[in-house]
């Protein structure tokens, strides 16, 4: 209840900007992708939608635009190192022939232990390879559910093991939530909290830059769902 005055104020500020936007802007739209399916808050669908948009080999026509916008937007945010972002951007700047980007939604890992095997599942696992250099981005998407006590810690361990096998910089770990709250688990200082409002802004800019792309209408409908 203590949060309602702040939420109301933020919503009021957002609505004041709407009259200055064109009527065709996604922020004005009442028709969206997920609400007809009663799936507005479905974490799996949002995760898969975001993974689709981040994957440059999918036929949406946005290439690496959204991924690059997210990396640039993280500059100056808590738990982010400038060198870390610059390393990722350098690899993204390579030509398509020089680099490989792998985006895997709902990636189930096999972890072998002394007495049992576990199968932790990361929401979005992104590997960027170019020559002898590699980078890793892990996105954990939480809309209504909270992370379990050791969930993020286990993902940190997966990222650490990946780094042992690839010459790379520090893995970029992103915690995506509606309000940008900090995770309650995981190692302090390792996860970057990103709110959906920031993501929506980057999606909108991507849409504005690619309105004639094959996936533009799909992106417009998804953006209206956020």
Regions found by a protein language model. Name each.
Residues 1-226:
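Charged, terminal alpha-helix-loop-beta segments
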